[in-house]
Regions:
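Mixed-charge interfacial surface used for oligomerization/domain docking
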Residues: 1-123
Length: 123
């Protein structure tokens, strides 16, 4: 997942006010992984484009040429979701895809503009 802003994470208490302000001023986009119900911040990049690229790279590192089912999730940002889906479809060995809204519990904490990939093996 990549967050468009840390403002909602700040309001939910997951990120401090100073961190959110600095991220906003520097146009930093955090990268988070949700695995087994645990959210972990795993990186930060300077632009939205770089963040989406890094999300795809992480998927490639995990699945390389392995056949996968691919889902793109988004929080009120269908356009970014569609772009991410098109890019990912061209790079992965995809068996099936879906694009859907991010769950309400995550969208509330991460805010609008959050976009991510969900990959799992097709075999």
């Amino acid at each position: 997942l990549t967050l468009d802003t840390l403002e909602y994470a700040r309001m939910s208490g997951r990120v401090g006010a100073l961190s959110a302000a600095l991220a906003s001023a520097l146009n930093v986009k955090p990268i988070a992984v949700l695995k087994d119900g645990i959210i972990e911040m795993v990186g930060k990049v300077r632009t939205r484009k770089a963040a989406l690229k890094r999300v795809i790279e992480m998927g490639q590192e995990a699945y390389s040429d392995q056949p996968v089912f691919l889902s793109v999730v988004h929080a009120h940002d269908l356009e970014s979701g569609k772009k991410l889906l098109a890019e990912a479809e061209s790079l992965f060995n995809v068996k099936d895809t879906i694009i859907t809204d991010l769950s309400v519990s995550l969208a509330t904490n991460f805010g609008p503009g959050t976009v991510g990939l969900v990959l799992y093996p097709a075999e």
